[in-house]
């Protein structure tokens, strides 16, 4: 019995020792666990700091521009690849637990592995080049010897000198090829442009070759403006700019540099802005509407009139449905020019032929089939003068106008103008299917000239008068807004031509045209004569300075069988006023059945009843009294 308490007394001591040992082991394990966790937290914090530093350095190149570099993003998987090695080491520590204590040197040694592979040091670079570019393998060292890159670089440097190396660097990322076609000097020249393994950071952008000197800049400016991507290049079209075309290139050719996403419109025919057109066929209308593509002459552009969106081309006005069928019709038209403007005389090859609209039938116009865009019809102005497009023209195949020199501020140019003699009308087909020759061919034929203004072409048919009573309301509705731009000098006077002008058009006083009165509002500063309404007031240089009217808008058939054209406003006593009064009188009636038809009281209809509906729907029902049927007939109403 005594051994039992001794044994029982020794048991608690053993348990206490076991408990003490257990607590000691637990404390050691807890201490080891705390050390491990502290190591993990320290390594995790350091890893996060390193990752943030690397991301901040890699993002520093994006902060300079508005868009990220796509080429650098494509190489980003190799940038972030070293960041996964510390996580693998941490996982290894977690799996091994207390057995393996990972030293901190191993955490950082993984970052040096890509560089130690190539035997290079990263301590000399303040930015840590490991995180800025992928490891430069041997394949990347041969990038600069790519023949395709050399071709694109040489073409880029020759065409776009002031673009610098930025455009060449955008074209740089091509698959690396081993090619030893370049010499060492060429590799050195293109090394800083095609350093693709190094990312396009601001440091690299500062090393780009500087623009060329100012002389080469000015020489290459025009070619660089007109240069387009190769997807938009049109073969066999080369623009050689002249000395005076640099001022207008920024406005005219600014829309050509559109890139590859928009269609190339250079194959369409627009008038050439050059004074000497490249195409020999452009001589006919390089001078007519070469100022802009909307057909406005140069004088309108100088006076401040720009082409409105609603303005149509001069040669394709669909509103013209009549042409001049008398080819010998002309009159003495003197246009007033503002001071300080050169007014060269017309070329002797000025010819009265026409740029009519393509909407007219070609059989009636005698259109040349191979020059469909400029059909030749009997009356047109094709001035051959190429020096200045703001031409003040005179057409004087007739006797001079009876007009005093001091015609209310209008300067009349009485100098003789050489004009070609017009062919007699009988052998000249007006409405035929035969195509007429080219304009430049007819200009070569018309080389003779007259030094007088008294040439009288024979014609048997007089032209009827055209009466005009136009005011602001009718003119503003008849023409567009930009054609009545009030920029003409007010000294031009109230009437440009006097009211009693006689045009001895056809050689005999008996067949001369009647007097034409042109009444206009003096605020408009626009006066029209008989000649301007006969087609001589178009935009082809005839009345460019005096008339701001729509080109080729007023045409009239002057064949002898055409009635008078009377354009009136609301204030004149005309047929339109009578019609408006009649319509107003009818509208006053209100179309009331009582007042309009004046039915008898017994014939006034009331609301239909069921009996009336049954009578109307019954086809077999006959009216009992024929007098009732007679009363409903239309002749009674």
Swiss-Prot record:
Residues 344-365, 396-407, 430-447 have a biased composition (Low complexity). Pfam families: TORC_C (PF12886), TORC_M (PF12885), TORC_N (PF12884). One of its GO terms (molecular function) is cAMP response element binding protein binding. Residues 145-159, 309-337, 377-395 have a biased composition (Polar residues). The modification Phosphoserine is found at residues 66, 133, 145, 293, 377, 396, 561. The modification Phosphothreonine is found at residues 143, 151. Residues 105-184, 269-288, 299-462, 615-637 are annotated as: Disordered. One of its GO terms (biological process) is protein homotetramerization. Residues 105-115 have a biased composition (Basic residues). This is CREB-regulated transcription coactivator 3. The lineage of its organism: Eukaryota, Metazoa, Chordata, Craniata, Vertebrata. The gene is crtc3.
